[in-house]
Structures are given as structure tokens and as C-alpha cells.
Design a protein with these regions (language model features):
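N-terminal "arm"/small-domain region of PLP-dependent enzymes with the aminotransferase-like
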Residues: 1-66, 80, 274, 280, ...
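Conserved PLP cofactor-binding pocket of PLP-dependent enzymes
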Residues: 30, 330-344, 355-373
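Conserved core of the PLP fold type I
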Residues: 54-55, 61-196, 210-211, 219-227, ...
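Hydrophobic beta-strand scaffold residues
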Residues: 138, 202, 232, 358-359
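Conserved Walker B
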Residues: 206-207
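Active-site PLP attachment segment
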Residues: 221-263
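Structural signature of PLP-dependent enzymes
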Residues: 265-284, 290-319
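Conserved PLP-binding catalytic core of the aspartate aminotransferase-like
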Residues: 300-353
Length: 386
């Protein structure tokens, strides 16, 4: 019966957001939120997005369903943006955001016989929940030394022994959340070779294309992996790259042998039908309009370049700080919005209670959430607690 349902604990990040909003201090800083913020602390709508919406408002003739696969032109354009020419051989379906794409992919892997999903840890906190909801077993594979801020490839590849043939592994393509630590091209090759040797299916999570080094640069490693493995699943989110978080724009791509593609598509369609039936259109239509119009595409890329430059500039300023023995200099080499600092629970609590600086309990910070004027205060607060 419904009245017997247990009370679930709130999402830790939502708890932090609530605490920040209720904090009366005017000099507080929210470094926990997972969205991009500009130098003024706002998350603006991109100019190209606004212009595309104007085009859609004037030209759209109907609000009927776009079809179960979704907007095929959107899928083609997003596939080309992420994977280049190889995307023409991928099966694709529009999804309800990146999270929806991850769930679709996990359900597909379960249908194919997978029982476990390896998660290089620490991972995005929602990955394990999605995996469990798909009735798969999430298995952590430690791969990062937070104290030294470096990837441990031996630990990662050694952890592949925890999986069996046909199991999967979720690997973030770029701008790792929560670490900001990306693999080199050579490391991507090593990962691909190790996955092939064990028969593990790569599940690439691409959510921050353009936030690291550039549109093509951010997916260069993932493309290398996809060229070397026979099968793969790829979840794509356009929430961050286009600043359209609430529109829930995602897609799932599957690399499979040609003879298997009809079965892949039929299974994806069945999974989608039982979950949400038809995907939403507005956000995907925005992305399609931007990517298919030369002027809008140029405007979008220019603004994305500005976002990336802002993040890199903040990283350089943080890296120049001296905070006791903390290896702050390595923050400059990390990519995207997030980094995880070597802080314990007591230090995270002290930053929040004594200095009004909010971050997740794991000490993940959103670099883009730190305004330039607040950097000196943040550094001094770190010195006080570290």
C-alpha cells in the first residue's frame, strides 16, 4: 500500500542548495550548484538560443509528435558534432536529457545480457542510482588520487577484472564531473585495448562538449576509443553546451555491427515507449536550428568560446594560489566546471559554517560558480581550514 512507502533521503546536492538559499549572509558563495555561471553569477540564455527560438516561433506549424526516434535532423547534427563521420554508422534515438539517455543505455545493456556497470570512482553521484534503477549492479573502480590530483591508470585497468564479458563501463568523455581530470589520447587507447581484451562494453557519457579545450578537442579521446572498440553506447547531453538545462535535451547513440542495428533500434524504441513514449521537441529543435544555420552556429561557438575562456581564467587564478600543502597548481590543467579538493568532511563543514562557502560533501567545487572578486576570500578560507 502507498502509506507503507519509506521516506527517502533528499538528494545531497539539493540539500546544499536549500541551505545556501536559507543562509542570510550576503558574502556567501555557492560552489555546489552544477550549472555554468558567468562573471556576474548568472546563467544567461545564449544569444543563438534566443534567436533560434524566434525562428521556431515564427515557423513552427504544429505541436504534434515528432516520432518515437525523435528529431532525426537533430540526431544527425549532434552525432556529427560529437563523433564526425563515424556517427553515420551509429543507431540513434532522442532522449529526455542526458540522464534519460543514460537510463536508456543502461536498460539496453541489461537487455543485451549485462549484469554490472563499472563506474570509475569518484563518479557523477547520479550514475550509481541510474544503474541500480535499470536493475544492474554498479561497481566502483577507484582511478583517481585526490590528494595528488592525478589519474591512476593501473588501478583503473586493474579494476576491469571486476566485470565479466558483456558488462559495461561508464566513462566520461571530457570535463569530468566531479574531478575535472581527463584522459590523454594514449590513456584512451589503453582503455580501449583493455576493454576489448575483457569484452567490456564502453558506455561514454558526453555532457560538457566545448567546456574543456574546444568542440573537437574535447571529444578527440572518445573518438579514438570509439574507433577501436566493436561496440559502444554513448549518452549525449546538450544542456550545458547550449545552456538549455531545463529543456532536457539528450540523445543516445549505439555503435554496433550493421546486422545488429535493426534489433538495437527496435529495443531502444520499446524501452522508450514504456518509459516516456515520445521525446520533447522544443530543446532539440533549438539545437537543430542553431547547428543547421551558419550564422547561429558561429554565434553559438563564439559564446561557447567565451564560457570556456572564463572557466580557464578562473582555474589559472586558483592555481596561482598557495594553500598550505594543497596542490592547487594542478587545477589549471583540469578541464571544465568541476574540481574536487583534498578536503575532509570537517573542513567542508567549516567552510560552510564559518565562511559561507558551500560545496558538496565530497569537496567538489564548481569553478564557474566562483566570481573573480570572491577568489581571494575563497583562498583565505581554504588556508584557514586546510
Amino acid at each position: 500500500m502507498i502509506e507503507t512507502l519509506p521516506l527517502k533521503a533528499p538528494d545531497p546536492l539539493l540539500k546544499i542548495i536549500k541551505m545556501f538559499r536559507e543562509d542570510p549572509r550576503t558574502d556567501k558563495s555557492d560552489l555546489g550548484v552544477g550549472v555554468y555561471k558567468d562573471a556576474t553569477g548568472n546563467t544567461p540564455v545564449m544569444r543563438a538560443v534566443k534567436d533560434a527560438e524566434g525562428v521556431l516561433l515564427a515557423s513552427q506549424k504544429t505541436k504534434t509528435y515528432v516520432g518515437q526516434q525523435g528529431d532525426v535532423d537533430f540526431l544527425k547534427l549532434v552525432g556529427q558534432l560529437a563523433f564526425g563521420e563515424m556517427s553515420r554508422e551509429f543507431v540513434s534515438i532522442q532522449a529526455v536529457g542526458g540522464t534519460g539517455a543514460l537510463r536508456l543505455g543502461c536498460d539496453l545493456l541489461r537487455e543485451s545480457g549485462a549484469k554490472r556497470i563499472l563506474l570509475p570512482a569518484p563518479c557523477w553521484p547520479n550514475h550509481p542510482s541510474i544503474v541500480r534503477a535499470a536493475r544492474l549492479e554498479p561497481i566502483d573502480v577507484p582511478f583517481f588520487n585526490i590528494a595528488e590530483q592525478r589519474i591512476d591508470m593501473d588501478a583503473l585497468i586493474g579494476g576491469f577484472a571486476k566485470a565479466e564479458r558483456g558488462d559495461g563501463i561508464i566513462i566520461q568523455a571530457c570535463c569530468h564531473n566531479p574531478l575535472g581530470a581527463d584522459f590523454s589520447i594514449e590513456q584512451w587507447k589503453d582503455i580501449a585495448d583493455a576493454l576489448n581484451a575483457r569484452g567490456i562494453i564502453a558506455f561514454v557519457d558526453l555532457a560538457y562538449q566545448g567546456f574543456g579545450d574546444g568542440i573537437d578537442e574535447d571529444v578527440a579521446g572518445a573518438r579514438v576509443l570509439l574507433e577501436r572498440v566493436p561496440e559502444a553506447v554513448i549518452a549525449v547531453s546538450e544542456a550545458k553546451s547550449f545552456g538549455i538545462y531545463r529543456e532536457r535535451v539528450g540523445a543516445l547513440f549505439v555503435k554496433a555491427a550493421e546486422k545488429a542495428r535493426p534489433a538495437v533500434m527496435s529495443n531502444l524504441a520499446a524501452i522508450a515507449r514504456a518509459n516516456y513514449s515520445m521525446p520533447p521537441d522544443h530543446g532539440a529543435a533549438i539545437v537543430r536550428e542553431v547547428l543547421s544555420d551558419e550564422a547561429l552556429r558561429a554565434s553559438w561557438r563564439e559564446e561557447l568560446d567565451q564560457i570556456r575562456s572564463h572557466i580557464k581564467r578562473t582555474r589559472r587564478q586558483l592555481a596561482a594560489a598557495r594553500v598550505n600543502s594543497m596542490p592547487m597548481h594542478l587545477i589549471a590543467d583540469q578541464k571544465g566546471m568541476f574540481s574536487t579538493l583534498p578536503l575532509n568532511d570537517a573542513q567542508v563543514t567549516a567552510l560552510r559554517e564559518q565562511h559561507g562557502i558551500y560545496m558538496t560533501d565530497s569537496a567538489r567545487i564548481n569553478v564557474a560558480g566562483l566570481r573573480e572578486a570572491d577568489i581571494p576570500r575563497f583562498v583565505e578560507a581554504l588556508k584557514a581550514v586546510a
